[in-house]
Each structure stands twice: as structure tokens, then as C-alpha cells.
């Protein structure tokens, strides 16, 4: 057993060096690709080659898809914190890597997964063959398992030289441990800590139909499609389509995309996207003061997050309704913890619910998830709500406050009864007024809802004025705000922007992507703002499948080499 531990240390050492060196390998590949291309101008809407880390959820989904939910259930994803980039954590995955401490976490997770896969409970249905002896190496059986499992984990076929190396690792470890399955576990661990498993690596090839242009390889396209639509790795059928070349034909790609869109796994993929787009990761640390809002518990906030996701998925996927109507619909879902905050009677579990016509609730902006997440722990915040409205749904970045702002005047206004009066302080300060004028008029229209999202008509005994304005549209109440939001010209364009960035693995670059995004937005409107149609348009587009060359080989080296070692430091400080 001591010698087996020595073998494990050798495997981990080699994998650790691979983790630190892999960027050099990929950088070299990118440079060679750049040198092999002609000097044609970048393809309109095409994306750069990217190397992006699997998110924590994608890591767990990968394990679950290949080995089963029960194996994944006890795994802590060994992924570093991600920085939200242009509104998405998923885009931040293209600019983050791993530190030496995280390499250790990756190794621990791999050891746990490998041990579970090959224990007596799982080996009989996860290993496709039976060894000649449980006590000795069996190169044939080991090779079959490692070849088939490696193909799913690497998301492409495993080169035979690599299979031979892994079989050798399994054989040597089996001899030392006196166990075929212990040896196989060590070889599986070596795969699981491979950078090619932990990172989604775009690879390009010349496009024979467009000389001088490049496209994603079939396997890279399969990964892009599956993590976009399913938030999970390609299944066997999608890998077969990549291997046969079907994904590089219009008919074959359309068949694959239509199959994925009709799968129940699409709901998982879109749940992950909207959870990211709405910054619902903030709920992981969100809390309300129990003295002020005793009815709001961790379970309440978790249900608030779930309510909005259920509403979105039911509206867009199950009923295939207009995306814009999410901001005016009265249809939602309700649970008992939420009903206490909404002031409604309800049953146990989740039930569909429609707010009556005379209710002040309509659309996502009146959900507890939006109202509570964008408030302080003891009170509402028109500024936070207006900022979130613009950034989440209109893709308009609101600047942070200047570092030298004096908040003393606002603090001294504590005896002023309403938020509208308190915020007049900002409007009298030139360094504050500019930003507050683009956030507060909309946020004040939501002051009928307190910091927990409960409806109210007064604040500190004073009747609330909830009139407001959104980009030239004036209204008297929250219904006017939701209508103005539904019809805002930037609303649909923002969803297109976010989906394109999410699907292609990094933030959009308007100098390259502007025309493609405009075309997608126009088509989205022509098709009634239906999400499945938009997803299909994106996935079948040349912009999604084409690759543009870097502006210089040096740019390729920097982009490929930074994530694993340098940029992670900035995300953890």
C-alpha cells in the first residue's frame, strides 16, 4: 500500500506539472494556428479561440452525466471563485485558472470520484468488462474502461498512446496494491486531474467551404453546444455526430440542435443561464435582519430564487411565450414559505399561482427575488433596484460611486420619512446626481415593496409616491414601470447579448459582434421573442461555429497563458 501511495504521488506530480505547463502547450497550438492562417480580416461575428474553466455546476454535471447522480452528490467542485464579467460568471471562466492550492483540491476530488466509481457498489455497472482476476492487472479490460470513459471525460476520443500510458499506470498500481480496481482507480484519477477535462478548450481547423477561414473542430463544437444548451458535457450521440462530421453539415447540425432543444436537459441548461444572468449567486450570502423581517429565513430566500426560475422556465420553455411578457405576467409559482411573505394562503409544495388583476404584483420586477436581493438588510433601496434593473435586464453598466463621496448628509437625513425624500440629498450633490438620475426614478416606483418584498402603501406613516420615469417614458405606478420595461428597445437585445456570450464562452466584443447581434435581435423579434427559436438561431449560426484569428501571435500566448497562474490571484484578493 505504501508503494501504491508512491504511485499516486508520482501521478499527481506529473498531473500537477501538466496543469501548470498546459498553457504553454495550448499557447503554442494557438500560435501555430495563427501562423497557418492567411491575413484575412476577422470573420464578422466569429469568436476567438478560448480556454475556459468548467464552472462548479458544470464540473458536477460532468461527473453526474458520466458516473451518475449518486457519485456527484458528495463531490465538492474544486473550482476557484469566478469574477462576474460583463454580467456573467460564465464569461469570467474564460479569464481564471487554478492556483497550487486549488490543484490540491482538484486532486482530492479526483481521488474521491475514482474511489466511488470503482467501489463494489458501482463497478459492476460502470466498468464495461470483468477482469480476469480482481487481484492482478488486466490490460484489455483496463484499456476498454479507460478508452470509453476517457472519451466522455475528454469530450473527444483518447489517443491510443495516451490509453497505453494509462493502462500502464493502472497495471503498475494494480501490481503494487494487489487489486485490479485500485490500479484502475489511480488511472481514472489521472484522467480526472487532466487539464483537458477541467478546461473547455476551443480548437480550430481550416474550413474547406471557406478558404482562409477557420471553424471549430467537430469535438469543440459539440462541447460548445452541450455546455450552452445543457450545461453538461456532450452525450454519446453528440460525440458520434462530431466524429462523423455531421456537425459540419447544415442538416446534421440542425438535427443535433433540434434534438438538444427537445430534450428535458434543456431546462437544466436554461436554469443555469438565467441563474447566472440574474446574479442569483448573491442569494448564497443574502440575509435579512431577523428583527426587522422575522418572516424571511434562508428557506424563504431559497424559495424566492426558485420561484423566479420556475416562472421563467415555465413561461419560456413550457408555454413558449414572448420573453417580454415576463415583465408583465401575473402567472407564477408559489410555496408555503413564500406565501407568508406575499400574504397569501397556499398549499404545501410548489403550486402554480396567478395574481389577481387588482394585485400590485406583475412580472419579475415584483418578485421577492428581485426586491429582496436588491435591498439592504433592514430597508429597501431604490438605487440598488434601479441599478439591477439596468444592469441585469438592459445590459447598461451603472458606474460605481466615486471614492471620495461624502455620505454624511444622507446619514443625517435618517429622520426623513420616505426614500424619495432621502434621495433628494444625492440629487443636490453633482458627483452623485448623474448616476442616481439613471437608477432612482425606476427604483422609487418599486417603493411599494419593502426590503423583504412585502407590499406596503406607506413608509413611516407617509403615503408613498411611486411615480417614475424610464428613459423618457413617464408613469404613475408599478404597472407603468413594468409596461415600460416590457417595451424597452434594449430588453430583447440584452438577452441576445447575454446568451451569445454565455454560449460562446466569453464576453462579446462589439467591434466584431455588433452586426451578428443585431441580426439575432431582429430575428428574435420576427419570431415573437420565443426563446427556443433564439437558441436555435444562435446555435446554427456561422457566428457560433466560426473562429476568428487573433490579432497577433503574441495575443494568443497572453490570452492562453494568463488564466491558470496569474489571473486567479486577482479574483481571490
How would you describe each model-predicted region?
Residues 4-25:
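Bacterial N-terminal signal peptides that target proteins for export
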Residues 32-34:
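C-terminal motif of bacterial Sec signal peptides marking the signal peptidase cleavage site
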Residues 36, 339, 352-478, 482-493, ...:
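Sequence context surrounding c-type heme c attachment/ligation sites in exported
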Residues 36-45:
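Bacterial Sec signal peptide processing site at the extreme N-terminus
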Residues 91-147, 447-493, 497:
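Short, functional "switch" segments adjacent to catalytic/cofactor/reactive centers
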Residues 113, 136, 140-141, 149, ...:
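Extended surface/linker regions that mediate inter-domain or inter-protein docking
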Residues 136-187, 195, 208:
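A conserved hydrophobic secondary-structure block that centers on an alpha-helix together
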Residues 213-222, 227-272, 287-288:
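Extended, well-ordered alpha-helical scaffold/bundle regions in very large, multi-domain proteins
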Amino acid at each position: 500500500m505504501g508503494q501504491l501511495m508512491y504511485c499516486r504521488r508520482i501521478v499527481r506530480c506529473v498531473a500537477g506539472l501538466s496543469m501548470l505547463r498546459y498553457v504553454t502547450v495550448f499557447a503554442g497550438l494557438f500560435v501555430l494556428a495563427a501562423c497557418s492562417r492567411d491575413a484575412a480580416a476577422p470573420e464578422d461575428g466569429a469568436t476567438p479561440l478560448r480556454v475556459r474553466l468548467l464552472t462548479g455546476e458544470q464540473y458536477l454535471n460532468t461527473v453526474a452525466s458520466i458516473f451518475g447522480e449518486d457519485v456527484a452528490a458528495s463531490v465538492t467542485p474544486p473550482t476557484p471563485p469566478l469574477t462576474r464579467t460583463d454580467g456573467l460568471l460564465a464569461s469570467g471562466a474564460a479569464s481564471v485558472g487554478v492556483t497550487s492550492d486549488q490543484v490540491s483540491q482538484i486532486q482530492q476530488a479526483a481521488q474521491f470520484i475514482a474511489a466511488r466509481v470503482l467501489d463494489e457498489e458501482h463497478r459492476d455497472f460502470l466498468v464495461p468488462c470483468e477482469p480476469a482476476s480482481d487481484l492482478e492487472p488486466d490490460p484489455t479490460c483496463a484499456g476498454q474502461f479507460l478508452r470509453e470513459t476517457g472519451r466522455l471525460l475528454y469530450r473527444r476520443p483518447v489517443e491510443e498512446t495516451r490509453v497505453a500510458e494509462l493502462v500502464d499506470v493502472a497495471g503498475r498500481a494494480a501490481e503494487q496494491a494487489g487489486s485490479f480496481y485500485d490500479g484502475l482507480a489511480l488511472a481514472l484519477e489521472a484522467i480526472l486531474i487532466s487539464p483537458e477535462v477541467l478546461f473547455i478548450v476551443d480548437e480550430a481547423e481550416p474550413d474547406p467551404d471557406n478558404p482562409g477561414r477557420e471553424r471549430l473542430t467537430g469535438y469543440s463544437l459539440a462541447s460548445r453546444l452541450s455546455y450552452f444548451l445543457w450545461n453538461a458535457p456532450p452525450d454519446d450521440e453528440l460525440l458520434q455526430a462530431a466524429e462523423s462530421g455531421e456537425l459540419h453539415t447544415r442538416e446534421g447540425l440542425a438535427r443535433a440542435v433540434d434534438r438538444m432543444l427537445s430534450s428535458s436537459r434543456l431546462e437544466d441548461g436554461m436554469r443555469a443561464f438565467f441563474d447566472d444572468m440574474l446574479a442569483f449567486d448573491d442569494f448564497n450570502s443574502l440575509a435579512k435582519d431577523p428583527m426587522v423581517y422575522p418572516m424571511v429565513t434562508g428557506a424563504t430566500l431559497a424559495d424566492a430564487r426558485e420561484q423566479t426560475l420556475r416562472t421563467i422556465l415555465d413561461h419560456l420553455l413550457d408555454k413558449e411565450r414572448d420573453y417580454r411578457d415576463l415583465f408583465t405576467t401575473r402567472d407564477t409559482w408559489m410555496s408555503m414559505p413564500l406565501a407568508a411573505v406575499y400574504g397569501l394562503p397556499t398549499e404545501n409544495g410548489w403550486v402554480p399561482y396567478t395574481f389577481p388583476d387588482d394585485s400590485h404584483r406583475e412580472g419579475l420586477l415584483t418578485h421577492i427575488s428581485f426586491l429582496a436581493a436588491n435591498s439592504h438588510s433592514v430597508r429597501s433601496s431604490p438605487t440598488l433596484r434601479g441599478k439591477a434593473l439596468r444592469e441585469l435586464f438592459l445590459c447598461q453598466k451603472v458606474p460605481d460611486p466615486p471614492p471620495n463621496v461624502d455620505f454624511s448628509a444622507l446619514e443625517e437625513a435618517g429622520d426623513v420619512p420616505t426614500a424619495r425624500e432621502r434621495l433628494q440629498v444625492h440629487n443636490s450633490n453633482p458627483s452623485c446626481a448623474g448616476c442616481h438620475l439613471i437608477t432612482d426614478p425606476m427604483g422609487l416606483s418599486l417603493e411599494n415593496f419593502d426590503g423583504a418584498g412585502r407590499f406596503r402603501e406607506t413608509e413611516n406613516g407617509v403615503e408613498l409616491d411611486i411615480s417614475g420615469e424610464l428613459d423618457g417614458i413617464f408613469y404613475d405606478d408599478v404597472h407603468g414601470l413594468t409596461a415600460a420595461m416590457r417595451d424597452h428597445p434594449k430588453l430583447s437585445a440584452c438577452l441576445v447579448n447575454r446568451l451569445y456570450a454565455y454560449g460562446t464562452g466569453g464576453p462579446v466584443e462589439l467591434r466584431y459582434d455588433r452586426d451578428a447581434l443585431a441580426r439575432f435581435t431582429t430575428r428574435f423579434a420576427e419570431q415573437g421573442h420565443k426563446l427556443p427559436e433564439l437558441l436555435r438561431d444562435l446555435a446554427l449560426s456561422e457566428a457560433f461555429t466560426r473562429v476568428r484569428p487573433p490579432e497577433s501571435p503574441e495575443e494568443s500566448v497572453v490570452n492562453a497563458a494568463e488564466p491558470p497562474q496569474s489571473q486567479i490571484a486577482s479574483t481571490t484578493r
